[in-house]
Amino acid sequence: MRDIWLIGAGVMAQDYIRVLQGLGRKFVVIGRGEESAKKCREITQCGVVVGGLERYLKSNPNIVSHAIVAVGAESLYHVVLQLLNYGVKNILVEKPGALYKWQF
């Protein structure tokens, strides 16, 4: 398996970081704001790419085999759509997964 993208840097993402570190997986944390990224770095000792997924994708990174989406509920749909459009096929989406029926 290639690297994993972990989208988000909040509390839930920090839990995923601990799990991925424990499993010895290679992953990239992609956060949006500097404040949450700084807090995440301090707690997990893990680097965070700041600027959000859209900005990160503009740098044309290699497609990963898996992504974990741990962002606020209002951003879930948009983030998952970006990942699918970029070609990421295996996506774990933190609940609720969607806010509206049409987002499924």
Annotate each predicted stretch with a short phrase.
Residues 53-64:
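Short amphipathic alpha-helix with an adjacent loop that forms part of the alpha/beta core around
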